[in-house]
């Protein structure tokens, strides 16, 4: 098959959806399929390159302005640059895809490539990554409005087949986009196990002068959906019992409320913010940690699953039925707390720091669970089976 993979976010940009799109593209190519990845320009990345067995084209893009608010996003829009509509369609005309894999329901490249697929009657999968939700009433209202008047009408016209990663995503998509079993597949997040089989690139404890005390790593961009507030508000209790604890927040800060709250609580000195780090360094941060947690507002995303795979005890905030068909057992093969529950975070962290043997046992079981169910090779095969079925159905209808 010829498969076009489309995502505004793509390496060298860091982030879960960027890494997942690139990893799946590499897997498709490794299995003998011809792959074209189309994304938005980013930093000094080449406009056109071949890597890992497939071609990557980066279209010129306009960056979203940084408004200096407590919430800002590093996003780029390709549709605003003159000629990009024509460039994109020419690329796809020349490539002649059998199917298109879109990533991100609110990205303009997904919409443009989706329009191409609709016009040419091509099967398309749309993976839902980030959910447009926020605990902040103002932002939450704005996101809901955008979903209602912009995103949902576009998706209703495009009619993609949805790929939904977890129960939170299922509930969200049913409510916002009217999805159902008839137009959806439920595949887990793909975790690149190979990235954690390489030598560590960095001595994180030495790099950040962490010493030998307990370290909590919280990895992933700070956005309203992952605001770090439950962890910050748990810190006074944690530090009271384990005064040497350091929290290392890894990722860009687009929502800085947690830093202000840390100042109010007098725990800011225990927090180190690194900014974004290369994908290759992520295993080193997990290896330096005693505990990893950042999905505390409801969720268990790529970073949390990678942390579990690495063999570090990881706390998330989902229910045991979060991944259809995958058995999660709190306290055995996963560590779960209720969303936005700082008291539960504090008690879980303290218990884990008090009992290194239990911490190591749960970490071992988490790693085995992720390796068995979320491995990139397993998830890629599920996507390819779906593409093959959709392509056959499309050929019959032509």
Language-model regions, residue ranges each:
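Nucleotide-activated donor-binding/catalytic signature segment of Leloir-type glycosyltransferases, i.e.
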Residues: 259-276
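Short alpha-helical donor nucleotide-sugar binding micro-motif in glycosyltransferases
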Residues: 276-277, 284-289, 307-308
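Short hydrophobic beta-strand element within catalytic cores of glycosyltransferases
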Residues: 313-322, 335
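Conserved acidic donor-binding segment of nucleotide-sugar-dependent glycosyltransferases
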Residues: 329-342, 351-356
């Amino acid at each position: 098959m010829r498969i076009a993979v489309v995502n505004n976010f793509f390496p060298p940009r860091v982030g879960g959806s960027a890494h997942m799109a690139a990893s799946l593209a590499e897997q498709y190519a490794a299995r003998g399929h011809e792959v074209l990845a189309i994304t938005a320009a980013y930093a000094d990345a080449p406009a056109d390159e071949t890597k890992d067995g497939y071609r990557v084209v980066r279209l010129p893009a306009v960056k979203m302005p940084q408004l200096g608010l407590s919430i800002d996003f590093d996003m780029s829009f390709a549709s605003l640059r003159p000629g990009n509509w024509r460039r994109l369609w020419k690329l796809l005309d020349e490539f002649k895809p059998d199917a298109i894999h879109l990533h991100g329901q609110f990205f303009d490249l997904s919409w443009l490539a989706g329009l191409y697929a609709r016009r040419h009657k091509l099967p398309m999968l749309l993976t839902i990554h980030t959910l447009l939700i926020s605990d902040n009433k103002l932002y939450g209202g704005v996101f809901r409005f955008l979903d209602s008047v912009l995103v949902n009408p576009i998706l209703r016209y495009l009619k993609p087949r949805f790929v939904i990663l977890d129960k939170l995503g299922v509930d969200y998509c049913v409510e916002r986009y009217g999805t159902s079993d008839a137009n959806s597949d439920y595949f887990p997040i793909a975790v690149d196990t190979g990235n954690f089989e390489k030598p560590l690139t960095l001595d994180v404890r030495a790099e950040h002068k962490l010493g030998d005390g307990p370290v909590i790593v919280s990895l992933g961009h700070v956005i309203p959906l992952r605001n770090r507030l439950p962890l910050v508000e748990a810190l006074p209790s944690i530090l009271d019992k384990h005064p040497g604890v350091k929290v290392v927040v890894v990722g860009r800060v687009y929502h800085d409320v947690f830093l202000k709250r840390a100042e109010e609580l007098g725990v800011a000195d225990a927090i180190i913010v690194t900014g974004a780090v290369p994908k290759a360094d992520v295993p080193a941060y997990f290896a330096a940690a005693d505990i990893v947690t950042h999905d505390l507002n409801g969720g268990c995303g790529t970073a949390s699953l990678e942390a579990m795979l690495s063999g570090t005890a990881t706390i998330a905030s989902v229910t045991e039925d979060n991944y259809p068909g995958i058995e999660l057992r709190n306290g055995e093969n996963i560590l779960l707390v209720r969303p936005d529950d700082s008291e539960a975070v504090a008690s879980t962290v303290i218990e884990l720091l008090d009992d290194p043997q239990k911490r190591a046992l749960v970490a071992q079981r988490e790693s085995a669970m992720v390796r068995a169910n979320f491995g990139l090779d397993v998830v890629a095969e599920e996507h390819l089976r779906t593409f093959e079925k959709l392509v056959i159905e499309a050929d019959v209808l032509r």
